[in-house]
Amino acid sequence: MAVQESAVQLSMTLKVQEYPTLKVPYETLNKRFRAAQKNIDRETSHVTMVVAELEKTLSGCPAVDSVVSLLDGVVEKLSVLKRKAVESIQAEDESAKLCKRRIEHLKEHSSDQPAAASVWKRKRMDRMMVEHLLRCGYYNTAVKLARQSGIEDLVNIEMFLTAKEVEESLERRETATCLAWCHDNKSRLRKMKSCLEFSLRIQEFIELIRQNKRLDAVRHARKHFSQAEGSQLDEVRQAMGMLAFPPDTHISPYKDLLDPARWRMLIQQFRYDNYRLHQLGNNSVFTLTLQAGLSAIKTPQCYKEDGSSKSPDCPVCSRSLNKLAQPLPMAHCANSRLVCKISGDVMNENNPPMMLPNGYVYGYNSLLSIRQDDKVVCPRTKEVFHFSQAEKVYIM
């Protein structure tokens, strides 16, 4: 029964942590399916139009040359339709195979073979590291690790590389690449009520003001801001006020609008919308898993100033992770468990806790192992006591 409950808990944990592993390729498949449908419908309508024109021409007494020309047009449109259909189906097939490959990989976690389970855990760790590196901007390192581990089709490298191109273009103060991304994902961004495209248009207006191209800025505003309403209308009104001030003005809020730091805000906004679009969290799975693990074993003993209670085997007590775990909550422990400082073994009825006269507690088996001439030396204070002076501790 306990084994079944443990298996169920593991399965639920995987569903939570591995959600992005399946969600990202599924969204890619869905996007390609909708794009294929639009392409095929468009090309089919073109074929229908030329066929209708051919039928209309044949209803009269057409010349041979005109019929041949129309037939060539039909053949050309059919060729385009076939090519677009083949390309679309191939793209969908690639995405479907990727989804299948990831599902098969996740199924491997329930293998009865210890060696296979160990390999799967290693791959899972590598996947977490690759995603974390991609989020941190270490793209080359992430790609090399994915290639070395053979997990290129199990991580979302393509999505992050696309995001990299957009972010780099924004760092160069260019909006074209990001606007193209917004156009590719227009329907889903609209459902999300994203304001990214509007923010980009506002920034383009600001840059025209910065370059003192005020007439171009007015034309830009008429083209892109005519449908603004609500809070967006307030932003437009504020931006239009810049027309009355020079680019080097020190008057707020126009000085803030002209601040180059707005480009960094656009990068953050794009990153946020990109994660929402693919239903990813703001933190990587590696970060969440590490924080959960540290919190599960964190105790007040890990932060005692004298350092006497720190364990060399405790990750939270280590210098590298101690500071990282500081803002995390303590472990919830309904039942206390005493661990011997000497051996690291649990103190229980088979290894009862024994207290020396100086107040330090050790396991009975550990005191036996260090006893010499019926005397024991406290590892912490170096005080010497008779073994008989150790008293059994009872936990209520």
Swiss-Prot record:
A zinc finger (RING-Gid-type) spans 314-381. GO terms for biological process: cell division; erythrocyte maturation; proteasome-mediated ubiquitin-dependent protein catabolic process. The record marks 314 as: Essential for ubiquitin ligase activity. The modification Phosphothreonine is found at residue 28. SUPFAM superfamilies: RING/U-box. Its EC number is 2.3.2.27. CDD domains: RING-Ubox_Emp (cd16659). It catalyses: S-ubiquitinyl-[E2 ubiquitin-conjugating enzyme]-L-cysteine + [acceptor protein]-L-lysine = [E2 ubiquitin-conjugating enzyme]-L-cysteine + N(6)-ubiquitinyl-[acceptor protein]-L-lysine. Core component of the CTLH E3 ubiquitin-protein ligase complex that selectively accepts ubiquitin from UBE2H and mediates ubiquitination and subsequent proteasomal degradation of the transcription factor HBP1. MAEA and RMND5A are both required for catalytic activity of the CTLH E3 ubiquitin-protein ligase complex. MAEA is required for normal cell proliferation. The CTLH E3 ubiquitin-protein ligase complex is not required for the degradation of enzymes involved in gluconeogenesis, such as FBP1. The expected RING-type zinc finger domain is highly divergent and most of the expected Cys residues are not conserved. Still, the protein is required for CTLH complex E3 ubiquitin-protein transferase activity. In addition, the conserved Cys-314 in this highly divergent region is required for ubiquitination by the yeast GID complex, suggesting a direct role in catalyzing ubiquitination. This is E3 ubiquitin-protein transferase MAEA. It comes from Macaca fascicularis. The gene is MAEA.
